[in-house]
Amino acid sequence: MSQASAQHTPMMAQYLKIKREHPEVLLFYRMGDFYELFYDDAKRAASLLDITLTQRGQSAGQPIPMAGVPYHSAESYLARLVKSGESVAICEQIGDPATAKGPVERKVVRIVTPGTLHDEALLDARRDNLVLAVHPQGDRWGLAWLELSSGHFSVLEVDGESDLLSEIQRLDPAELLAAESLSLPPALAERPGFRRQSDWLFDLESATRLLCDQFGVADLRGFGCAHLTTALTAAGVLIDYARDTQRSRLPHVTGIAVETRDEAVVIDAASRRNLEIDTNLGGGFDNTLASVLDTTATAMGSRQLKRWLNRPLRDIAQIQSRQAAVQCLIDADRHATLRDALKAIGDIERILARVALYSARPRDLARLRDALNALPALEHDLAELDEGTAIDALKHHIRPYPELAETLSRALVDNPPVVIRDGGVIGTGFDAELDEYRGLAEHAGDYLVELETRERERTGLVGLKVGYNRVHGYYIEIPRAQAREAPAEYIRRQTLKNAERFIIPELKEFEDKALSAKSRALAREKLLYDGLLETLNVDLQALQGTARALATLDVLACFAERALALDFVRPRLSDQPGLRIRGGRHPVVEHVSDHPFVPNDLMLDETRRLLVITGPNMGGKSTYMRQAALIALLAHTGSCVPADEAEIGPVDRIFTRIGSSDDLAGGRSTFMVEMTETATILHNATEHSLVLMDEIGRGTSTFDGLSLAWASAEHLVERRAFTLFATHYFEMTALTEPYDSVANVHLTAAEHRDGIVFMHRVEEGPASQSYGLQVAQLAGVPPRVVARAREKLATLEQQEVHQAGTRGGLGDSDAAAPQQADLFASAPHPVVEALEKLDLDAISPRQAMALLYEWREQC
């Protein structure tokens, strides 16, 4: 593509010039009814889209690879390209082909990237689609992220790569921007949608100036972020990127929200994955916490719900305000009414973003019209609710817009077409000029019949006809025999063998109007449509405030509905540390299970900070632990919780070390992954943290694993973190001896013949046995193997009993004690071994005294 322009046709020279300005993206070059791609773009698109790769003549002596997609169905192809991680520059014809000398003028009108989508067809309606920029300063990281399709713009600063990774995992951006020279962890640099930006763009002064221009302010102090210099640098790069891709000043991005880590319950990346908040371990949505809770009436409510679940609050006043709002909706029995009203609202948050970007389609405006018409009834319903809850702050924003509603109702037909280009969007009676053009185009036939009848009567020429052809336009045709009698005002237009054709001033005037009526109607309709967008943009900020308030109301109504439908209870929020749960349940397991869920109690307080949980595999240990974390999480979002009763103290972090998996790409074994996650917990857990530790130490030798598990538990006891510690090392149950704040609980099971019945009930004390062979039998291990395992187990247990007897005569130990070797039992001391072997009757008193002195030295 570097050949001189003279070697190319004018059209191809134009293409190459535009392509040079956008080398890193695919270029959709508009030619008539197609978007064409050339050269390497064509090859890549043909491969990704499975479309035909062809050629378009030659340029510079070489065949030009070409591929294309129809203009009218471009969205589906764009969706596939974006899903593949591609970005696409849309180059449109902006000149008039009729008047163009040479190639029609074209320019790139926007760049479609994974993180800057706003077209409805390209987005997941119920998930945020973010573009995020990062910038470091020492160990401090600044993050800025934008949801272009709604206008949400936020910043945050964190310390260290661990917190950075945690926040990026929470936000899950579709695109990630960073400086070219910045060294990033592989987990970020290898993310889909990762984009490098020029280093010089990351400049605080330029960023501040750009942000002030975006928000129309002199400085950023009013947003409470002027001190966040690292995050603001990232924010400036982000706004510049979004403006460039959209070719717009982004009028719907009117402010910036500041987040801090201290405001929310921190959930690190591993814990978020293990809890399956809105993404399951397979990367899907099914069987997640959000899948059970999300009965929101609108897509914007669904997105808000996921934000709340992924960022539980710590401020008790805010949480209680939400709780009170949910309780108010339940008590007033209004949640169902409100949810029905909200269904008529739709996703106006994203519609308004498209309005701001002048990309809203006719059906967007029709949905907005319907939403505005639904607001008066919704306002009335809210007015009847009690004061003193989170709903109070919403009432100010959820209000009617009668003038806008009336304008849209008059302007739009009931069911407009998908696009404006073919007309039929603006209703009759809204604009007299448009009605006139349409009348001319639609009723031309009626006029011609009426003119023909009138002229026959006026002239007396019974053979007179009015007609039309593409070459000569409209005409009055008179048979040759009667042509001499044509009135003087008839102007001859065409002579035929058997007739003469004439034009008259009235018909000429009609012709001028009729032939251009359709194009004029389309142009007028487009002008009126743009006028509607301008009118809506005047009230854009207020409308955005209404949309956000409606999304919040939707979540609160969803919480109320779920509380009633799933038998959730309002938790008490306490300033006393701990979790006190009676009849707690796992919300997801209960929802998807075909069997009744067995509820269990949980007591963690100042005197009981770590529970050692034992019991058989499949007995429910992991479920019991996860439900505790999910109940704490839900309580901090303001939701009711799955329990008979719950009192939740302050929680600053939720940690989980559950499950096992290799990190093959990162070159880490299962055990390395486990130890990395454990290290994060041990370094960061506080006295207000909730920690779930499941089967620590499984990936190494028994002695190493048990030692690590014991030491980790001791460390958590010393840090006073609230901990649920599940283990198959029965020696761990001895932690209750040195530590008063440790207690034992176990999941019950009962043997039935050669099988096992899991009771899923949590009881005090350690488990009596592991039931490993019974679980193996349930799993389908061959009977011969299970039988051989039983034989081996009996041998090992007999050896253990014998060894215990020789060590200290413990053969009569408590029958309830687990039959498992005490791996922490001390090895016999050399003095003890010598004493055991000594024949006391065969030595003299002097020899006995000498041995005592020798043994004392050894001790």
Swiss-Prot record:
Any Gene Ontology biological process: mismatch repair
This protein's record includes keyword Signal: no
Record InterPro entries: DNA_mismatch_repair_MutS (IPR005748), DNA_mismatch_repair_MutS-lik_N (IPR007695), DNA_mismatch_repair_MutS/MSH (IPR017261), DNA_mismatch_repair_MutS_C (IPR000432), DNA_mismatch_repair_MutS_clamp (IPR007861), DNA_mismatch_repair_MutS_core (IPR007696), DNA_mismatch_repair_MutS_N (IPR016151), DNA_mismatch_repair_MutS_sf (IPR036187)
Keywords, sorted A to Z: ATP-binding, DNA damage, DNA repair, DNA-binding, Nucleotide-binding
Amino-acid positions noted as binding ATP in the UniProt annotation, renumbered to this chain: G615, P616, N617, M618, G619, G620, K621, S622
Molecular function (Gene Ontology), one example: damaged DNA binding
Keyword Translocase assigned: no
Matches recorded under Pfam families: MutS_I (PF01624), MutS_II (PF05188), MutS_III (PF05192), MutS_IV (PF05190), MutS_V (PF00488)
GO cellular component: cytosol
HAMAP family with a match to the protein in the record: MutS
Family indicated by similarity: Belongs to the DNA mismatch repair MutS family.
Annotated function: This protein is involved in the repair of mismatches in DNA. It is possible that it carries out the mismatch recognition step. This protein has a weak ATPase activity.
UniProt cross-references to PANTHER family, sorted A to Z: DNA MISMATCH REPAIR PROTEIN MSH1, MITOCHONDRIAL, DNA MISMATCH REPAIR PROTEIN MUTS FAMILY MEMBER
Protein's name according to its UniProt entry: DNA mismatch repair protein MutS
Organism: Chromohalobacter salexigens (strain ATCC BAA-138 / DSM 3043 / CIP 106854 / NCIMB 13768 / 1H11)
